[in-house]
């Protein structure tokens, strides 16, 4: 009880001081305002700042808050002081900031969402185009089985021709090798025959020369020659 009386006594000079402070402020505001604001517009702005979806709910919230504030102040459950004014001023600044900055933030958010949506749509379009191009490139290969079959037949024929060509080449190489061996054998036989003939000729010449060096053979040849000459002379007579 004593505490309640003390609070009432301390609240009276504070309220009086606040009233004396608010009087010149109101006068200055009145003198600095160029034109009075429309009460309907001001009420609409206050209602718009309150939470809620309908005007009835916003009005109920405002009336309930005002009644609670009046009840708290009248019963001195809450003492109006400088902190209350500071909180009210801060709340007003915050609400004003929300009111004026919210549209700019909404515009920024909408632009950002549009930008991201544009990027996503562009990426989706590019992806769809890439998929379509891939489908078209794959559809061009729908006859790949027939083409592969033809190429396989051609490759089989090519392998067969290559095998035949390799076989013919082996035969030609074998014939050339056989001809080379035969030619070398003929050359060897010719060289052996020539060597044998040379040896025979050399032996005959050596034998004749040895016979010519024999005096008996020389005398025999001389007698045979004289006989031949006499025979020729006899025939001439």
UniProtKB/Swiss-Prot annotation:
Cross-referenced SUPFAM superfamilies: ATP synthase B chain-like (SSF161060)
Lineage start: Eukaryota, Fungi, Dikarya, Ascomycota, Saccharomycotina
Cellular compartment(s): Mitochondrion; Mitochondrion inner membrane
Transit peptide start-stop: 1-30
Swiss-Prot/TrEMBL keywords: CF(0), Hydrogen ion transport, Ion transport, Membrane, Mitochondrion, Mitochondrion inner membrane, Transit peptide, Transport
Classification via InterPro entries: ATP_synth_Bsub_B/MI25, ATP_synth_F0_suB
Job description of the protein: Mitochondrial membrane ATP synthase (F(1)F(0) ATP synthase or Complex V) produces ATP from ADP in the presence of a proton gradient across the membrane which is generated by electron transport complexes of the respiratory chain. F-type ATPases consist of two structural domains, F(1) - containing the extramembraneous catalytic core, and F(0) - containing the membrane proton channel, linked together by a central stalk and a peripheral stalk. During catalysis, ATP synthesis in the catalytic domain of F(1) is coupled via a rotary mechanism of the central stalk subunits to proton translocation.
Domain of life: Eukaryota
Entry's Gene Ontology molecular function annotations: proton-transporting ATP synthase activity, rotational mechanism
Cellular compartments per GO CC: mitochondrial inner membrane; proton-transporting ATP synthase complex
Family membership noted in the UniProt record: Belongs to the eukaryotic ATPase B chain family.
Pfam family of the protein (one): Mt_ATP-synt_B
Protein name (Swiss-Prot/TrEMBL): ATP synthase subunit 4, mitochondrial
Gene3D superfamilies, alphabetized: 1.20.5.2210
UniProt source species: Kluyveromyces lactis (strain ATCC 8585 / CBS 2359 / DSM 70799 / NBRC 1267 / NRRL Y-1140 / WM37) (Yeast)
Gene: ATP4
């Amino acid at each position: 009880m004593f505490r309640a009386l003390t609070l009432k006594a301390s609240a009276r000079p504070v309220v009086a001081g606040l009233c004396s402070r608010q009087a010149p402020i109101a006068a200055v505001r009145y003198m600095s305002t160029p034109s009075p604001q429309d009460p309907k517009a001001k009420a609409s702005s206050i209602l718009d700042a309150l939470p809620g979806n309908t005007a009835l709910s916003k009005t109920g919230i405002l009336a309930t808050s005002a009644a609670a504030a009046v009840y708290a102040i009248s019963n001195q459950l809450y003492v109006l002081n400088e902190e209350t004014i500071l909180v009210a001023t801060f709340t007003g600044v915050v609400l004003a900031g929300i009111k004026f900055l919210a549209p700019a933030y909404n515009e920024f958010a909408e632009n950002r969402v549009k930008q991201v949506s544009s990027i996503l749509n562009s990426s989706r379009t590019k992806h769809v185009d890439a998929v379509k191009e891939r489908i078209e490139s794959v559809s061009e290969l729908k006859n790949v089985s027939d083409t592969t079959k033809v190429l396989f037949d051609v490759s089989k024929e090519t392998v067969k021709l290559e095998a035949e060509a390799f076989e013919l080449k082996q035969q030609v190489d074998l014939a050339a090798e056989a001809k080379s061996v035969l030619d070398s054998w003929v050359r060897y036989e010719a060289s052996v025959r020539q060597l044998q003939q040379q040896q025979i000729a050399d032996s005959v010449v050596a034998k004749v020369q040895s016979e010519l060096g024999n005096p008996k053979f020389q005398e025999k040849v001389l007698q045979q020659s004289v006989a031949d000459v006499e025979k020729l002379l006899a025939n001439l007579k």
